């Protein structure tokens, strides 16, 4: 069976989309190719790396990438993770489905916010898998 492609997008491809990519590569790997990107690039947030490391997922080699139109047009699903990405997401081909899963931005917030958002993203991806 050919894998589908899911593309997670947030503002800076720094926290939320990086954590979503890390979780999805673990949870959805059998059925989905997983990518993430941002409207801008802010670099991968070190606290996002640490938050994922805490649950045994290594995203330290991830890079902060701009949206790639080739990945978009070959995606089955684009998931925006913040309102900025939802509003500024490039127009999608008609065959690409889009969903918005809004999460708070943990950047600049206490460590507990990174943990909370990380865990909320995991739950959303697990719920998506069980659909």
Curated annotation (Swiss-Prot):
GO biological process: response to arsenic-containing substance
Recorded name of the encoding gene: arsC
NCBIfam families: arsC_pI258_fam, PRK13530.1
Subcellular location: Cytoplasm
InterPro entries on file: Arsenate_reductase_ArsC (IPR014064), Ptyr_pPase (IPR023485), Ptyr_pPase_sf (IPR036196)
EC category name: oxidoreductase
Family, as annotated: Belongs to the low molecular weight phosphotyrosine protein phosphatase family. Thioredoxin-coupled ArsC subfamily.
The keyword Magnesium is annotated on this UniProt entry: no
One annotated Gene Ontology cellular component of this protein: cytoplasm
Organism of this sequence: Staphylococcus aureus (strain NCTC 8325 / PS 47)
Described purpose of this protein according to its UniProt entry: Catalyzes the reduction of arsenate [As(V)] to arsenite [As(III)].
Matching Pfam families: LMWPc
Protein name: Arsenate reductase
Active site per UniProt: 10 (nucleophile), 82 (nucleophile), 89 (nucleophile)
Catalytic activity: arsenate + [thioredoxin]-dithiol + H(+) = arsenite + [thioredoxin]-disulfide + H2O
Record EC number: 1.20.4.4
Keywords for this protein: Arsenical resistance, Cytoplasm, Disulfide bond, Oxidoreductase, Redox-active center
Record-level Gene Ontology MF annotations: arsenate reductase (thioredoxin) activity; protein tyrosine phosphatase activity
Disulfide bridge map: 10-82, 82-89
Primary site of residence: cytoplasm
């Amino acid at each position: 069976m050919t894998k589908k492609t899911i593309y997670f997008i947030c503002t800076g491809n720094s926290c939320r989309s990086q954590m979503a990519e890390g979780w999805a590569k673990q949870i959805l790997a059998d059925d989905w190719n997983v990518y993430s990107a941002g409207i801008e690039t802010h670099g991968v947030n070190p606290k996002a790396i640490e938050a994922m490391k805490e649950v045994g997922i290594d995203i330290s080699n991830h890079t902060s990438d701009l949206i790639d139109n080739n990945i978009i047009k070959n995606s089955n699903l684009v998931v925006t993770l913040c309102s900025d990405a939802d509003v500024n997401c490039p127009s999608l081909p008609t065959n690409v489905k889009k969903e918005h899963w809004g999460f708070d931005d943990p950047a600049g917030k206490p460590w507990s916010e990174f943990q909370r958002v990380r865990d909320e993203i995991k739950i959303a991806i697990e719920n998506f898998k069980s659909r």
